[in-house]
Amino acid sequence: MFVFTYPAEKYDELNIRKTDILHLINKHITVASALKKKMDYYEGEQAILERKKEDGAPNNKLVCNHAKDISDTATSYFIGEPVTYKSDDDISDLLKALENAGADEADGDNGLDLSIYGLAFEYMYAKEGQTELVCKNLSPLRTFMVYDDTIEQNELFAVYYYRKKDDTDTYPTQYIATVLTQNYKYVLNIQDSNEPQETTEEPQPHYMGEVPVNAYQNNKLGIGDFELQIPLIDAYNAIMSDRVNDKEQFVDSILAIYGALLSDEIEDEGEGTGTQKAMKKLKREKLLELPDDSKAEYLTHTFDEAGVEILRKAIEQDIH
């Protein structure tokens, strides 16, 4: 898991530099490509769909979505029941505040993100003009936490960003980045450029007293629940796809005739070569007459169904 760091001695929450934030965003985009692969697998966009074969060869691409099964099951066990809070003191006001903040929904989203990405981010804020807090899950594809470079790895600030949509492609890429420090919130408009950019946006105090984003890890290394099983998932998809391919190849087997020509004495079968006419007649009549010293058989690929089934079950067991 990549950890974003910033020199502690250079950090000033009242002097956030756009060039630094842009550099961090570009690094996160690289990290996010690996995270996106995990979401692709969860959604069924898996490697088997990119497989290519020679023209004419069966190329079924079956996705047996074990990734989704694993994450949905793990999330149900982990956060299927809402989180409960107990205290010797009266915390009814706190529970009411958490309910109003949408904590249960955020917990569910966080649990699924932890299972898929190995990471989750939760943003706590007050809506404009209101005092009640709101909990919102932020996508790890567009969110990261930055720590200082000390041994304690203290949280300095969190960044949530997105690319400003411009379908004309006539202007340089721009990012809208929300930077959340211990005391302030910045909303920065950053151009994807090597030119220096001055931070003209004024920070707004958020009154939380700490970075209002919680960063969670599924485990110490931030590994998702099915991440290490991806090679096995690919192997399972390949086996199931090849199984269907072999069945199709069996149906499309080549007819081999020894000691005779299929096109002998074929007439009135329309256009085409003698062999093509013979094949039309054979398909229609389902009957083949051959001399005594000749024979016919289908050339088929030997398919060890029992062996493949044993391998399939072994891989499936390893996945789970």
Q: Would you name each region that the model predicts?
A:
Residues 1-135:
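Extended, helix-rich architectural segments
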Residues 11-14, 21, 25, 39-42, ...:
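Extended hydrophobic/Leu-rich segments
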